[in-house]
């Protein structure tokens, strides 16, 4: 959005079929506190609805109470509390425990099962176009490591349905910490997984978010 020739606000939207994610929304400082954020968000949501978008997702920092209140007033509801974790225990590496696995082979299996029930940034579709590698423990538990930065980031865990509730996810997290000291996640993991990460020696990050969603069909 422009005020004359000067940018006043910006929104970045990612699309995935009939769903969209508000990847970024920002106002220049001079335009804040004037009700413009609400007005522009209403315009954006109307535009997305006209383009056939049915559901909109976004993430917001939990402590940003003003932003949370704004999104709630527009009709967004909290879907997940999101946390991040980092491995803090120094464990000696054990070679050969983890093996590489074809990325697309895992994603095809995980996409079929997830059925859009995960947070947007954890949906397996996210990783189909990102630089990443997959490692596996016993060909039953799998981890996606994104490799766009200087060090890998743990971005996704998946255990075969028949192998769940056997401790494999915890074993995989511990093996990852051994092979990649200091490995962490982004703030994209549902907070219900905190006990799992704690049991594997990972510490929660201080930053926390909400994923919020809005059904435009009800708007």
Task: Give each language-model segment a name.
Residues 6-14, 21-26, 138-158:
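Conserved beta-strand in the GNAT
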Residues 15, 28-30, 34, 62-63, ...:
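Active-site acidic-Proline motif in GNAT/NAT acetyltransferases
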Residues 31, 35-43, 163-175:
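Conserved acetyl-CoA pyrophosphate-binding loop and the N-cap/start of the following alpha-helix
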Residues 37-78:
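Hydrophobic alpha-helical segments and helix pairs
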Residues 48-59, 178-192:
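Conserved GNAT acetyl-CoA-binding A-motif
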Residues 59-61, 72, 77-90, 203-216:
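Conserved catalytic-core motifs of GNAT/GCN5-like acyltransferases
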Residues 74-146:
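Amide-forming acyltransferase catalytic core, primarily the GNAT-like/NAT-type
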Residues 134, 154-166:
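Flexible loop/N-cap segments at domain edges
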